[in-house]
Amino acid sequence: MRTNPTTSSPVVSTLEEKNLGRIAQIIGPVLDVVFPPGKMPNIYNALVVKGRDTVGQQINVTCEVQQLLGNNRVRAVAMSATDGLMRGMEVIDTGAPLSVPVGGATLGRIFNVLGEPVDNLGPVDTRTTSPIHRSAPAFIQLDTKLSIFETGIKVVDLLAPYRRGGKIGLFGGAGVGKTVLIMELINNIAKAHGGVSVFGGVGERTREGNDLYMEMKESGVINEKNIAESKVALVYGQMNEPPGARMRVGLTALTMAEYFRDVNEQDVLLFIDNIFRFVQAGSEVSALLGRMPSAVGYQPTLSTEMGSLQERITSTKEGSITSIQAVYVPADDLTDPAPATTFAHLDATTVLSRVLAAKGIYPAVDPLDSTSTMLQPRIVGEEHYETAQRVKQTSQRYKELQDIIAILGLDELSEEDRLTVARARKIERFLSQPFFVAEVFTGSPGKYVGLAETIRGFQLILSGELDGLPEQAFYLVGNIDEATAKAMNLEVESKLKK
């Protein structure tokens, strides 16, 4: 049974209804709390510790019940630092799970795991809240139709298309354009689909979170002058926060996204960076709760925890949540339980290549390593499928020939191979694209390219109709007509120089 959003405050409202307990034990971020007989809180209930420490500083710590131990004792995990807490302090059972603000008022704001704004812009203008623990939509509510989620980014739409309501793994190291790609997707979904985005920073570096916020303001994704016109809500649980906060911040972001899908009936883009740190935080909490570790030291409940998050990310008859998740692979070991469990849920993978980024090809999406379960003739159609396969075959052949070219040069290749290389280099450059969010850096206007235009462009390159055009004409353009126009301009410029 799904819990509907309510207009009640997450804070305990009436003093007489308080269910009070006392702290019996503190082990780092884990508290044992004793309640009166018959007054035990439920699993996942939020507990609040209020008071003052030994030097008179105000304490306000929210915890979540994880285990019922018997003898009227529960074990809870704190969502913030437990500094200053002492045995015997009073604990209030709120009688409900953690609830966070939802709705349009969350756009343009930054929240912590508890749904509290942390951007110094004052309180959130909404009384509608929703619990972070909810069941996944029932089968009868799901939209089982397989449909492509058009992003307007050529390389993604052609070679590794996203599924509407699907989950995409984003693999990329530092400095290859991951943040810019994320911001462009946020911008494009707002323009083309009228949708909104939610960004969940799970175990992020504080600096990275701050940089993302500043870049979003600079590019207009967050509108400083009119915050209500912003296209994204941000939820951060940084590296320095307790494992409880890092474990639950993904659910906070997902709950905000669910409201836009279920109530506003919108298409939502949910970013989780990094899904590995969600697993890592769960592993820390599991050890603190005294559970026996499983393979490679991970929690025994790894699959259950991952499933409870991922199954809520789906398409319903009202709208969809399409999730893009950054995936860190420990020691590049794809068999590690954390990434292996994540892969089982993914519909597509977008791999960013440092080699392409070094060449200046942006977005630096690797056309051969990126995959999608949606790239099938019965889903995307024969024309799209055939074009994508031919683009991949040409790129693969070019990759195989690169060693020969490096040693012997282009002249030693056969006529057919030289033609393949020329077309592959045009394809490589045509897969680049000017982004709207990068306009402030490049000075070039951004381009949204529809799927039909993308397919037409690559078909013309593969057919040989554009063999006479210089390869630089295909670099950082939108559709194929722009490449043709750019080639004419280059020709005029070269004549003028002569």
Swiss-Prot record:
<dbReference type="GO" id="GO:0005739">
    <property type="term" value="C:mitochondrion"/>
</dbReference>
<keyword id="KW-1278">Translocase</keyword>
<keyword id="KW-0813">Transport</keyword>
<dbReference type="InterPro" id="IPR036121">
    <property type="entry name" value="ATPase_F1/V1/A1_a/bsu_N_sf"/>
</dbReference>
<dbReference type="InterPro" id="IPR027417">
    <property type="entry name" value="P-loop_NTPase"/>
</dbReference>
<keyword id="KW-0793">Thylakoid</keyword>
<dbReference type="InterPro" id="IPR000194">
    <property type="entry name" value="ATPase_F1/V1/A1_a/bsu_nucl-bd"/>
</dbReference>
<dbReference type="Pfam" id="PF00006">
    <property type="entry name" value="ATP-synt_ab"/>
</dbReference>
<feature type="binding site">
    <location>
        <begin position="172"/>
        <end position="179"/>
    </location>
    <ligand>
        <name>ATP</name>
    </ligand>
</feature>
<protein>
    <recommendedName>
        <fullName>ATP synthase subunit beta, chloroplastic</fullName>
        <ecNumber>7.1.2.2</ecNumber>
    </recommendedName>
</protein>
<dbReference type="InterPro" id="IPR024034">
    <property type="entry name" value="ATPase_F1/V1_b/a_C"/>
</dbReference>
<keyword id="KW-0067">ATP-binding</keyword>
<dbReference type="InterPro" id="IPR005722">
    <property type="entry name" value="ATP_synth_F1_bsu"/>
</dbReference>
<keyword id="KW-0150">Chloroplast</keyword>
<dbReference type="GO" id="GO:0042776">
    <property type="term" value="P:proton motive force-driven mitochondrial ATP synthesis"/>
</dbReference>
<keyword id="KW-0066">ATP synthesis</keyword>
<dbReference type="GO" id="GO:0046933">
    <property type="term" value="F:proton-transporting ATP synthase activity, rotational mechanism"/>
</dbReference>
<keyword id="KW-0547">Nucleotide-binding</keyword>
<dbReference type="GO" id="GO:0009535">
    <property type="term" value="C:chloroplast thylakoid membrane"/>
</dbReference>
<keyword id="KW-0406">Ion transport</keyword>
<dbReference type="InterPro" id="IPR003593">
    <property type="entry name" value="AAA+_ATPase"/>
</dbReference>
<keyword id="KW-0375">Hydrogen ion transport</keyword>
<dbReference type="Pfam" id="PF22919">
    <property type="entry name" value="ATP-synt_VA_C"/>
</dbReference>
<keyword id="KW-0472">Membrane</keyword>
<dbReference type="GO" id="GO:0045259">
    <property type="term" value="C:proton-transporting ATP synthase complex"/>
</dbReference>
<dbReference type="InterPro" id="IPR050053">
    <property type="entry name" value="ATPase_alpha/beta_chains"/>
</dbReference>
<keyword id="KW-0934">Plastid</keyword>
<comment type="function">
    <text>Produces ATP from ADP in the presence of a proton gradient across the membrane. The catalytic sites are hosted primarily by the beta subunits.</text>
</comment>
<dbReference type="InterPro" id="IPR004100">
    <property type="entry name" value="ATPase_F1/V1/A1_a/bsu_N"/>
</dbReference>
<dbReference type="Pfam" id="PF02874">
    <property type="entry name" value="ATP-synt_ab_N"/>
</dbReference>
<comment type="similarity">
    <text>Belongs to the ATPase alpha/beta chains family.</text>
</comment>
<dbReference type="GO" id="GO:0016887">
    <property type="term" value="F:ATP hydrolysis activity"/>
</dbReference>
<comment type="subunit">
    <text>F-type ATPases have 2 components, CF(1) - the catalytic core - and CF(0) - the membrane proton channel. CF(1) has five subunits: alpha(3), beta(3), gamma(1), delta(1), epsilon(1). CF(0) has four main subunits: a(1), b(1), b'(1) and c(9-12).</text>
</comment>
<keyword id="KW-0139">CF(1)</keyword>
<dbReference type="InterPro" id="IPR020003">
    <property type="entry name" value="ATPase_a/bsu_AS"/>
</dbReference>
<dbReference type="GO" id="GO:0005524">
    <property type="term" value="F:ATP binding"/>
</dbReference>
<dbReference type="InterPro" id="IPR055190">
    <property type="entry name" value="ATP-synt_VA_C"/>
</dbReference>
